[in-house]
Amino acid sequence: EKDKIYGILFDGAWLWEEYLNTILKPCGFRHPENKSQKGGLKMFQKDADNETISKNSRKLYPDFWKDDFILDAKYKHLNNGVGREDLYQVVSYMYCTTAKNGAYVYPYEKVEDPVSYQLSGYKGIIHVAPLYIPQTEMIFEDFIAGINGSEDRLRNFLQSKDN
């Protein structure tokens, strides 16, 4: 009995996406369900082309999107930069949807401003936006106030770029 270990496993990346959905949905972002193949975007203009070129009915499933914005939820720090595959994925989604903005949102333990980078070509912009998660609050109400402020900062930033 003393050597037993009890625990729970969960998909932190999935939970992070669902949490972000509560913040982003009121801003008009859609959250496709790639596992159930709902809400995907077309890669090609003609449906027949999806089958002809790939034999796999290519659909795009960004974590979040709206008219001129692609957003990727990352449950990892991006302070050392965005990984190559992550970058190519968002740029591809932006290109296929002609979105001017792409963003990565990730949890962070400090308050930091988002950083923006202009792409070559059609001049889209990639934003790297840390979402501050309060770490030191000892009272639940203080944590709630801190996280609400973080959520508001993220919403305000994204809405300021969506013009």
Predicted regions, residues:
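Catalytic core segments in nucleotide and nucleic-acid processing enzymes
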Residues: 3-163
